[in-house]
């Protein structure tokens, strides 16, 4: 289960998605996350599917790697679909069961929400799979640059967000190691009452928090040893360059956002 979470990991490559400016990728992901949940139109949902899988294919990330990452989230997607299927009414009756009645409205709502979740995970994963931590930090810093006028520490905020995102795989690996160690000691996480199973998590959470603080302290020490003193006066070896392909990608996502807005406010 722990190996199947890919958000926060980076896959080296030289695809067109890898070469995109991190600012356009961050903006595209933000637009997609906001407007994906706003749309209820099947045609726009189809466009979102094409955008998601088009980006996945263009990134040249192995489909097997992505499929592994969807293994865990698929449980949530299926559960969401089933809950809507049995708990949402409206429309025509499809089938009547002894314990529930399935309506066409529940089927459509469940399918659309499940697809939205899958597409959001795809786009969010593409951001970290195709963007290095340094580029991600630089992109966030440049996007937050206007807030420097109100004395906001934009570089430090961008660095914290980037580090937090990149610590996800590390924490997952730490959790997996601790769980395996506890299983080797005979700990059973699946039997007993709910209270006993919650108590069994304590030997996982305590060392996990301890290791997290230890790694944070080691990272801070390493940054200080390398002379890091914040972003003031810091120069960058690699400069960000906004090109034609970045403008095209941004225009595509802005058109998607405009179409969703038109559907919401003009289509009722």
UniProtKB/Swiss-Prot annotation:
Species of the source: Bacillus selenitireducens (strain ATCC 700615 / DSM 15326 / MLS10)
InterPro entries per the UniProt record, alphabetical: ABC/ECF_trnsptr_transmembrane, EcfT
GO CC terms in record: plasma membrane
Keywords: Cell membrane, Membrane, Transmembrane, Transmembrane helix, Transport
Family: Belongs to the energy-coupling factor EcfT family.
Subunit-structure text: Forms a stable energy-coupling factor (ECF) transporter complex composed of 2 membrane-embedded substrate-binding proteins (S component), 2 ATP-binding proteins (A component) and 2 transmembrane proteins (T component). May be able to interact with more than 1 S component at a time.
Signal sequence interval, chain numbering: none
Source organism phylogeny: Bacteria, Bacillati, Bacillota, Bacilli, Bacillales
Main location: membrane
Role noted for this protein: Transmembrane (T) component of an energy-coupling factor (ECF) ABC-transporter complex. Unlike classic ABC transporters this ECF transporter provides the energy necessary to transport a number of different substrates.
Membrane protein topology class: Multi-pass membrane protein
Entry's localization field: Cell membrane
UniProt GO MF annotations: transmembrane transporter activity
Official protein name in the record: Energy-coupling factor transporter transmembrane protein EcfT
PANTHER family in alphabetical order: PROTEIN ABCI12, CHLOROPLASTIC (PTHR33514:SF13)
TM region(s), chain numbering: 29-49, 75-95, 107-127, 152-172, 242-262
């Amino acid at each position: 289960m722990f190996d199947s979470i890919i958000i926060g990991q980076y896959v080296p490559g030289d695809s067109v998605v890898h070469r995109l400016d991190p600012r356009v990728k961050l903006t595209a992901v933000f637009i997609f996350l906001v407007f994906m949940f706003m749309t209820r139109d099947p045609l726009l949902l189809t466009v979102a599917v094409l955008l998601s899988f088009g980006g996945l294919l263009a990134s040249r990330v192995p489909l097997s790697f992505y499929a592994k990452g969807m293994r865990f989230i698929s449980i949530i997607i299926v559960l969401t679909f089933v809950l809507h299927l049995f708990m949402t009414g409206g429309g025509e009756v499809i089938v009547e069961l002894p314990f529930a009645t399935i309506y066409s409205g529940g089927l459509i709502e469940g399918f659309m929400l499940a697809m939205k979740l899958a597409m959001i995970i795809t786009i969010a994963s593409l951001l970290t799979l195709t963007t290095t931590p340094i580029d991600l930090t630089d992109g966030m810093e440049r996007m937050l640059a206007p807030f420097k006028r109100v004395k906001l520490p934009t570089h430090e905020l961008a660095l914290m967000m980037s580090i937090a995102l990149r610590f996800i795989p590390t924490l997952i690996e730490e959790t997996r190691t601790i769980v395996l160690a506890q299983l080797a000691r005979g700990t059973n996480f699946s039997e007993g009452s709910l209270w006993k199973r919650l108590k069994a998590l304590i030997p996982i959470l305590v060392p996990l928090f301890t290791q997290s603080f230890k790694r944070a302290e080691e990272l801070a020490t390493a940054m200080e040893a390398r002379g890091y003193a914040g972003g003031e006066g810091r120069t960058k070896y690699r400069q960000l360059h906004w090109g034609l392909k970045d403008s095209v990608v941004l225009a595509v996502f802005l058109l998607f956002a405009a179409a969703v807005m038109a559907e919401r406010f003009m289509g009722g």
